[in-house]
């Protein structure tokens, strides 16, 4: 099925892709994305590894009810996580040449 050179070349390509993916995963883990809610009144900065780095709350929200503020913080966190997922897919598509991961398979973070 494969000649000696063909199999060796295939293994070399697989190793190169694995190295590129590892490098890309490190890059993704270091990146930061900002999620927003309430038209920018609440902002959450999250790393590619889904660690929340910073929460910014507009002072005008401190006078409103606690439950609404909690909802806005949760929405901003979810927005940041969604942006990270989109960015990860785009970055990995660069490495894999647009080849999609199988459904349900996620990045190892």
UniProtKB/Swiss-Prot annotation:
Name of the protein: Nucleoid-associated protein Sputw3181_1707
Subcellular location: Cytoplasm, Nucleoid
Species assigned in the record: Shewanella sp. (strain W3-18-1)
Major localization listed first in the record, in broad terms: cytoplasm
Reported function: Binds to DNA and alters its conformation. May be involved in regulation of gene expression, nucleoid organization and DNA protection.
The UniProt record lists the keyword Glycosyltransferase: no
Cellular-component GO terms for this entry: bacterial nucleoid; cytosol
Domain of life: Bacteria
Subunit comment: Homodimer.
Family: Belongs to the YbaB/EbfC family.
GO molecular function: DNA binding
Keywords carried by this UniProt record: Cytoplasm, DNA-binding
Cytoplasm in keyword set: yes
